[in-house]
Swiss-Prot record:
Amino-acid positions noted as binding Zn(2+) 1 in the UniProt annotation, renumbered to this chain: H80, D113, E176
Annotated source species: Colwellia psychrerythraea (strain 34H / ATCC BAA-681)
Name of the gene this protein is made from: dapE
This protein's name: Succinyl-diaminopimelate desuccinylase
GO biological process, one term: L-arginine biosynthetic process
Binding, Zn(2+) 2: D113, E148, H366
Amino acid sequence: MSKIEQKNQSEVIKLAIDLMSRASVTPEDAGCQKLMAQRLAQLGFTNESMIFADTTNLWSRRDSTNATKEDDLVFCFAGHTDVVPAGNLELWNTPPFEPTIIDGMLYGRGAADMKGSLAAMIVATERFVQDHPDHHGSITYLITSDEEGPFINGTTKVIDTLEARNEKITYCIVGEPSSTHAVGDIVKNGRRGSISAEVDIKGKQGHVAYPDHVRNPIHLAMPALTELSQVQWDNGNDYFPATSFQLSNINAGTGATNVVPGHINALFNLRYSTELTDQIIVEQVESILDKHQLDYDIKWTFNGKPFITEHVESEHGFLNAVSQAILSVTGTETQLSTSGGTSDGRFIAPTGAQVIELGPCNATIHQVNESVSCDDLEKLVDIYYHCLVNVLCTHKTIS
């Protein structure tokens, strides 16, 4: 895209291009947060950079000048500046870190996940503060460069810092690409919990011709793994489908056909609803392994607990405020969903915050030729703007 063409673009497209031009492959930030902080500082935000190990985080806050009970409200935009690697550059039609507009679509790594959302948040906030400088409550930003990586030094560390200071978030919009066919058609009002395990089941190695001298760990493991795959963990509920157990890796053997291996290693994951806890899952899995009298070691990884922001039958509910914002911009009713993977919302929700995810369409995320509709980004600015208005310009505390 030429400089002349860039000058003709709207504010949200220009900012998205600026952010996308920075190769912030996780955990790098590549100056994205500095750019955002500069824009926010001009609006009266106080910026705090929180650096943990290799991760850069930004906590930015603008407080109300009013002294009313509504000013206890803290509205947060949350997101990440890091992106996944571009992969094979030969498969891209355009360079992944040279944003290009073709037929109304903005192409480049991070277009949908989630630098387009970050640009829309900033532009919406600029417009809102200009129109409503005396708004109620506080507007905050929680931005990390460690969402696509191991999620160790990112949002979770920022939340720990805020909790230690008793600094709370009331309502949070995570800008993950939640939409499916059109911007705003899907809002994620929760996510399933995720728990993973690596189990190493021991046997006795030996020659296949002498079965009396071996204990085949593959034979020993398969009945237990089969039983785990057939467990009806729960029936789900109004917000979540039934819990899912999936084996993702099984490894055993030396590569020789005449050697019984000494152990088998299996990886599995459960995506679970609010009907279960991680402790219940651990106990049930290990009881099944014990029932089959296996000699095993198991390592658990707790990726995040399930969370839900429930719909409240009130015109002042947070979900209603978001839904009305979408309706006013797109003319369509949004649908609520808890499907898909995890997000950093799982670290924010346990503090008591009401958390939703709202962003552009997700059809091309993590793929080559990732893209986002320019028109959708314009609409997303309007949606975020109306969310701010609906939450911070009412004189009634929303539920």
